């Protein structure tokens, strides 16, 4: 029996019956009785870049009042490479203030999310995005997601190449349905059947993620992707890419047959072969991925079930060529470099830390300050995969003006932070994510206060630990790569993972389960004390934990990636 001779999941039925991702969205959007969509349409709208959520802080209160949940929607941009113009940034701020919760959320995949949207506002939001030459097509759903690329290599031409390939891949793998334009933008309704030669009528078994890394920076965490391309530069030019297949971090609590996996580096391709490889890997996953069990539907499980050699044989049969042996590469960091950096073209770029990736006006008027910068600067605004923001192409004449705006709005406070805070990351979690089991974005600053105090207590003040926190085990903030990873298990309780590195090349491992804040600190204190007294020169905490063999034995999963 093949993997897909089993009974298909209900999501497969919904996709097959959706009439090219249309479903009954028109009817759902016009239904005034509820703030929600019809049940099947909740799945269909994901392919349009939108998730239905509810405001969970009010769920119990509204239930007591016999009201339906406060349904809201999250819309996510399709933004290959994470690049915006100043005018586009200003448009996003206007949309957030008019229709959302007056904030923009930078994601770990170089995109922007709007939270707090109500059903009647969805069409005006997407039309406003269209006027800004932006959209949300395929930002969610069982398709190729936002293609990410290294945001700030020191050589400007290398960034331009990586960004260019992110755009090309994104366009090449875009679904062909006209449903988005019909439903949201008033496009002509198509009654004849549509054929999508790439995706078919049921699209992919699950989401599909692609990244382009430019060594020595691995800000995209390229080995966590379904498909990764590592740029290889030789003699000052782009020679091609190492191809990485089968990464993915999401897992489920208490399901040991779900696991994190780092991608295998399978070979090297020339630039002109990139699109063919991307298409072939996607189609092979389309045809062989598990459509009966969505917990096993990602590419990493397909690769492990088929075997890497057989999987790549099929990919190469589809492309008509074989990959060359992989070429040497080296990553030095996966974090962002904050402050001013000089580019090779005479301009400068400025990287700002964005607390929790949340751009809003609070103690620091961040949204207003960035709007002011966008009005005066005509270069690019780049989003990083660490949920931060980079202003690129600042001329020597502009720099004093930019520094004046930084001081006026207090944004210069985002340039000099404790390293453990600057390199931390959290997913959104509560109160909007329906999957969250615990806090993340709202709790991380509190936990970092305690971690900073603990580091000072043991003589490690200023240590650049990587701390990542998620509200559930799906891994959106990539906690399974961190030196200290916290994964929500229940309200106030987290599984503690230790032993990742600072380059995105090694998974961490489970150390303790279901710990509250005090138990987390009690677990970390003796380890950090030991690290302070016994570390080698230049050794990181993650490397120390591994060298000292402080982690439990591997649980013996089929394949949990390179350790």
From Swiss-Prot:
The UniProt record gives the binding positions of [4Fe-4S] cluster as: 427, 433, 472, 476
Subunit composition and interactions: Alpha(8)-beta(8). The alpha component is a flavoprotein, the beta component is a hemoprotein.
Q: What is its EC number?
A: 1.8.1.2
Q: How is the cofactor bound?
A: Binds 1 siroheme per subunit.
A single GO molecular-function term is: heme binding
GO terms classed as biological process:
cysteine biosynthetic process; hydrogen sulfide biosynthetic process; sulfate assimilation
Required cofactors, per record?
siroheme; [4Fe-4S] cluster
State the InterPro entries in the record: CysI, NiRdtase/SiRdtase_haem-b_fer, Nit/Sulf_reduc_fer-like_dom_sf, NO2/SO3_Rdtase_4Fe4S_dom, NO2/SO3_Rdtase_4Fe4S_prot, NO2/SO3_Rdtase_4Fe4S_sf, NO2/SO3_Rdtase_FeS/sirohaem_BS
Q: Which family does it belong to?
A: Belongs to the nitrite and sulfite reductase 4Fe-4S domain family.
Per the record, what are the reactions this protein catalyses?
Answer: hydrogen sulfide + 3 NADP(+) + 3 H2O = sulfite + 3 NADPH + 4 H(+)
Query: Single GO cellular component annotation?
Result: sulfite reductase complex (NADPH)
Root EC class: oxidoreductase
Record's keyword annotation contains ATP-binding: no
* Binding residue positions for siroheme: 476
What does this chain do?
Component of the sulfite reductase complex that catalyzes the 6-electron reduction of sulfite to sulfide. This is one of several activities required for the biosynthesis of L-cysteine from sulfate.
Query: Which UniProt key words apply to this protein?
Result: 4Fe-4S, Amino-acid biosynthesis, Cysteine biosynthesis, Heme, Iron, Iron-sulfur, Metal-binding, NADP, Oxidoreductase
Species: Acidithiobacillus ferrooxidans (strain ATCC 23270 / DSM 14882 / CIP 104768 / NCIMB 8455)
The pathway this protein participates in, as annotated, is: Sulfur metabolism; hydrogen sulfide biosynthesis; hydrogen sulfide from sulfite (NADPH route): step 1/1
The name of this protein is: Sulfite reductase [NADPH] hemoprotein beta-component
Report the gene name. Answer: cysI
SUPFAM superfamilies to which the protein is assigned, alphabetical: Nitrite and sulphite reductase 4Fe-4S domain-like, Nitrite/Sulfite reductase N-terminal domain-like
Nucleus as UniProt keyword: no
């Amino acid at each position: 029996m093949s993997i897909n001779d089993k009974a298909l999941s209900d999501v497969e039925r919904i996709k097959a019956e959706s009439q090219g991702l249309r479903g009954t969205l028109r009817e759902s959007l016009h239904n005034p009785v509820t703030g929600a969509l019809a049940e099947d349409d909740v799945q269909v709208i994901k392919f349009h870049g939108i998730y239905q959520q509810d405001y969970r802080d009010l769920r119990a209160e509204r239930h007591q009042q016999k009201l339906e949940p406060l349904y809201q929607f999250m819309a996510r941009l399709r933004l290959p490479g994470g690049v915006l113009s100043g005018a586009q940034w200003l448009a996003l701020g206007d949309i957030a203030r008019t229709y959302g919760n007056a904030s923009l959320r930078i994601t770990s995949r170089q995109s922007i999310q709007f939270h707090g949207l109500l059903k009647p506002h969805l069409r005006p939001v997407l039309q406003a995005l269209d006027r800004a030459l932006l959209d949300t097509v395929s930002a969610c759903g069982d398709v190729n997601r936002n293609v990410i690329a290294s945001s700030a290599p020191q050589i400007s031409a290398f960034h331009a190449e990586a960004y260019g390939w992110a755009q090309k891949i994104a366009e090449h793998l875009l679904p062909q349905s006209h449903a988005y334009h019909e439903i949201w933008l008033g496009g002509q309704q198509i009654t004849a059947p549509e054929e999508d030669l790439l995706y078919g009528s049921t699209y992919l078994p699950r989401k599909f993620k692609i990244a382009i890394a430019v060594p020595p920076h691995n800000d995209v965490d390229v080995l966590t992707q379904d498909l990764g391309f590592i740029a290889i530069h030789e003699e000052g030019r782009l020679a091609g890419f190492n191809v990485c297949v089968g990464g993915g971090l999401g897992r489920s609590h208490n399901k040991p047959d779900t696991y994190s996996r780092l991608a295998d580096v399978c070979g090297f391709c020339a630039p002109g072969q990139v699109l063919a490889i991307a298409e072939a890997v996607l189609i092979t996953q389309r045809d062989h991925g598990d459509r009966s069990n969505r917990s096993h539907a990602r590419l990493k499980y397909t690769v492990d079930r088929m075997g890497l050699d057989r999987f790549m044989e099929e990919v190469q049969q589809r492309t008509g060529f074989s990959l060359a042996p992989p070429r040497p590469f080296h990553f030095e960091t996966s974090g962002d470099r904050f402050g001013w950096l000089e580019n090779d073209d005479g301009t400068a770029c400025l990287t700002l830390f964005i607390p929790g990736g949340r751009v809003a006006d609070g103690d620091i008027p961040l949204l207003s300050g960035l709007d002011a910068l966008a009005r005066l600067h005509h270069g690019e605004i780049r989003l990083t995969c660490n949920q931060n923001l980079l202003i690129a192409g600042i001329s020597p004449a502009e720099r004093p003006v930019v520094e004046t705006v930084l001081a006026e709005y207090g944004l210069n406070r985002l340039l000099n932070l404790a390293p453990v805070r600057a390199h931390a990351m959290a997913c959104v979690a509560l109160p909007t994510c329906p999957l969250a089991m615990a806090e993340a974005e709202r709790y991380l600053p509190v936990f970092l206060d305690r971690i900073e105090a603990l580091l000072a207590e043991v003589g490690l003040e200023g240590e650049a630990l990587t701390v990542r926190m998620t509200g559930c085990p799906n891994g959106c903030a990539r906690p399974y790569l961190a030196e200290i990873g916290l994964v929500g298990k229940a309200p106030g309780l987290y599984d503690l993972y230790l032993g990742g590195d600072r380059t995105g090349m090694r998974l961490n491992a489970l150390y303790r389960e279901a710990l509250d804040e005090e138990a987390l600190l009690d677990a970390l204190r003796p380890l950090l004390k030991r690290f302070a007294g016994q570390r080698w020169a230049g050794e990181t905490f993650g490397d120390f934990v591994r060298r000292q063999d402080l982690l439990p034995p591997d649980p013996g999963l089929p394949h949990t990636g390179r350790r």
